[in-house]
Amino acid sequence: MLTLARQQQRQNIRWLLCLSVLMLLALLLSLCAGEQWISPGDWSTPRGELFVWQIRLPRTLAVLLVGAALAISGAVMQALFENPLAEPGLLGVSNGAGVGLIAAVLLGQGQLPNWALGLCAIAGALIITLILLRFARRHLSTSRLLLAGVALGIICSALMTWAIYFSTSVDLRQLMYWMMGGFGGVDWRQSWLMLALIPVLLWICCQSRPMNMLALGEISARQLGLPLWFWRNVLVAATGWMVGVSVALAGAIGFIGLVIPHILRLCGLTDHRVLLPGCALAGASALLLADVVARLALAAAELPIGVVTATLGAPVFIWLLLKAGR
């Protein structure tokens, strides 16, 4: 007779295997789907080399990594702030990256290359992260640090609104496209941004022990000997980096970091040894499928992926909000 622990372990393995298969199928669909359907047997043809390897593959890898980063960031923040409604934009890091990108667009008059825009977005996210770490060094409680992040996000949102109000029509088109999120401009030139995500993603997936302690609450984590101040600073910095790079790649994409971790917890994946890799797989799968919808929904244009995730995620967010209020 299997013990309860072994049964749970087998169930967790089955979940990870199912999520891995789902991600591989979503990856395959993303590479095949488009204006022209290209089956795997045609990938070695000249048409396949152009459309699949040069156009679709870099975009698909970017979608996969950003989806994984946003979902893991959501799981980290929900454990760190003991709030199931926490998500990557909550601390203002996404808006900070947006301010950096908008400043680059306006000051560069739309002439800066994509790599420079990416660096400015990362710089904006890291500046907000440094401000948050400054607050954290004052040993604020988690709730106060959360409120500080919300306030910073509101300030950054106001700055973006002012910038859009005073921008020209050409700049406004680029800014509005960024605010809705999209992978349309991603190619192999952004591979350095993709590589910048991988080490942090892998490192966080290996930090299940402190994450499990943090999920028990501040008091319990201290009693178990966890250096709370150190881990809070490190996790805030790692989240800021992942969100900044994600914004630099694709703009503002919401609800992935909110919905994916919560759904996996409802499915019984509460141990961060399973939850963190599960979030990476499920977040990548969800964003890959949303990207396919964004590409195929309209014949003559491509939907912003942020619109797709918001349309699908908003009802779930309302449901979570009502459930949390009971």
From Swiss-Prot:
Residue ranges of the TM segments: 15-35, 61-81, 88-108, 112-132, 146-166, 184-204, 240-260, 274-294, 302-322
Record GO terms (molecular function): vitamin transmembrane transporter activity
Signal peptide residues on this chain, from the entry's feature table: none
Topological category with respect to the lipid bilayer: Multi-pass membrane protein
Localization: Cell inner membrane
GO CC annotation: plasma membrane
GO BP terms in the entry: cobalamin transport
Keyword terms of this UniProt record: Cell inner membrane, Cell membrane, Membrane, Transmembrane, Transmembrane helix, Transport
Predominant place of localization: membrane
Pfam families tied to this protein: FecCD
Listed InterPro entries: ABC_BtuC-like, ABC_transptr_BtuC, ABC_transptr_permease_BtuC
Function: Part of the ABC transporter complex BtuCDF involved in vitamin B12 import. Involved in the translocation of the substrate across the membrane.
Family statement: Belongs to the binding-protein-dependent transport system permease family. FecCD subfamily.
Subunit note: The complex is composed of two ATP-binding proteins (BtuD), two transmembrane proteins (BtuC) and a solute-binding protein (BtuF).
UniProt-recorded name of the protein: Vitamin B12 import system permease protein BtuC
Taxonomic lineage from the root: Bacteria, Pseudomonadati, Pseudomonadota, Gammaproteobacteria, Enterobacterales
